[in-house]
Design a protein with these regions (language model features):
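Fe-S-dependent hydro-lyases/dehydratases of central metabolism
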Residues: 1-2, 6-262
Length: 262
């Protein structure tokens, strides 16, 4: 029979074989929709949270937190995907979260948070009346959502990561629908707070100050004092619940990426 001779030319022209010829100095070229994860800060000593969504449905699904379907093409683009977070449930969420994030970005850049996001100026002054030692050097500013029972449904970690890249530092819930969603929050460096059922001591767009939150995580506290900040400071209790030592370290580092990097 006639011998079949394979022509590798087409394959060689389309596929790069780096075996034995790899050059680490060459920078990988990414397509326009492939983006790196933004840098994520370690857990600050003190934390100021703005509630940017308040959801009282009995259950909030991961598909409501970040819809599937048309968003799938953005899974390689964390910030692009985050634009769709809560879009079907609370369209105002993304804009509010990004406004708050301006303050944290200013802190990380060594700039004035109150200048970047003037709304926090009076809030910080109220905080300093009781906690005079709070400065930008020991403070993080971010967003949180409240939902009665978030995280039911599919296991998509983007339900948590989209909140993180928009400046989310925490969730507050009466309970979490799945251990998986709570674990995803932890892996993205977000505090999985719970609060007792009943009338909420805060509302959407309120600020919550959590003093010494880093020490609370280090010391394995489960009940964490916090304050709703309006004209004054109203004390509330947030529950952190059980965390393994590794989970605490992940939160302290800022996210699982930082945990492995360090």
């Amino acid at each position: 029979s006639e011998m079949c001779i394979r022509d590798r030319t087409i394959y060689d022209n389309r596929v790069f074989d780096s075996k034995g010829v790899a050059d680490p100095s060459v920078e990988i070229q990414f397509g326009p929709n492939i983006k790196d994860w933004p840098e994520m800060s370690a857990l600050p000593q003190n934390m100021l949270l703005k509630v940017v969504s308040e959801i009282h449905d009995p259950v909030t699904t991961t598909d409501e937190l970040i819809p599937s379907g048309e968003t799938s093409s953005y899974r390689s683009n964390p910030l692009g995907l985050a634009e769709f977070a809560l879009s079907r449930k609370d369209p105002a969420y993304v804009g509010l979260a990004k406004e708050v994030q301006k303050a944290q970005k200013a802190i990380e850049a060594g700039e004035d948070a109150a200048e970047a996001f003037p709304e926090v100026k009076d809030i910080l002054e109220t905080v300093k009346e009781s906690y005079a030692d709070v400065t930008q050097d020991n403070l993080g500013i971010g967003s949180t959502i409240f939902a009665v029972k978030p995280g039911d449904g599919s296991a998509r970690e983007q339900a948590a990561s989209c909140q993180k890249v928009l400046g989310g530092w925490a969730n507050i819930a009466n309970e979490y629908a799945t251990k998986r969603y709570r674990s995803n929050l932890i892996n993205w460096g977000m505090l999985p707070f719970t609060i007792d059922k009943g009338e909420l001591p805060f509302k959407n767009k309120d600020y919550i100050f959590v003093p010494d939150v880093r020490k609370a995580v280090e010391d394995k506290l489960t009940k964490i004092p916090a304050y709703v900040v309006n004209e004054g400071m109203k004390e509330i209790t947030l529950t952190l619940g059980e965390l393994t030592d590794d989970e605490r370290e992940i939160i302290l580092k800022g996210c699982l990426i930082n945990y492995y990097r360090d």
